[in-house]
Amino acid sequence: MNTNQVTAVAFLVAGAIGTARAQQATFSSRIDAVRVDVLVTDANGPIRDLGRSDFEIRDNGVLQQIDLVSFEQIPLNVVLALDMSDSVAGDRLDRLRAAGTAILGGLQSGDQAALVTFSHVVRLAAKLSPDIRSVRTALARASGDGSTSLVDGAFMGMQVGASDAGRELLIVFSDGLDTASWLSADKVLDVAKRSDAVAYAVAVRSRAKPEFLRDLASFTGGRLFEVEKTERLDSVFLQILQEFRQRYLISYTPRDVMKEGWHKLDVRVKRGGTVKARPGYQS
């Protein structure tokens, strides 16, 4: 078995353990409380003055009592999961580094960040930490080579950002299709349904459709950005951060619903507006 295979196998074993722990923790938290990040917009942009009485949330069709609606600047756990395959080189790599540096520069006191890179292997380049400088240094040292383990990279990103404190924002960038992952897309999407992370995906537009990234963003209440080129990648990353900070955090304790299985969520605003939130969660 070569070095790359050993690395991949070790990652899978560690990932399987991490998944079991994450699912167990998520299941227990679902019994106590469910947290839902919600973006509400109108023709003028995000609506910022809503309170608890303005929202309705249904869990599997059952109207729930909302315990808390917060629009505070709750600290963020931001994980960058970046494609470093051999197609990300030269100017494209420089622009990706600049975009990552821009979003790290937009973080505030109390926020944490981490960096995951993926090519033919997945690397935790910088663990989740309030030391943003160390993440910036790891980003500056990152380089591209090999094929693309997109699904594996997204999986590790969700594991790295999981925390009882802070709101979890996962940003996944890729310029191509997955060619080297060991984990299946369905498996990782199932983990996403159990996660509190909101995933935003950035894909370079090509003939191949980024279905995995689209599903990942959809299941977590995030958004997919498809870009023609990478010249303005930094503005896209900053737009993601700004949009995420405009979200409300809704918390409720499920009542009169089955605790196991898929829970369909329906979030509405009584006074109007377009609502974006995860479609449900798996417990």
Regions found by a protein language model. Give the residues of each.
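Scaffold/interface architecture of coatomer-like assemblies
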Residues: A22-S283
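Bacterial N-terminal signal peptides
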Residues: T7-A16
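Positively charged n-region of N-terminal signal peptides that target proteins for export
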Residues: M1-V6
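Small side chains
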Residues: G15-G18, A113
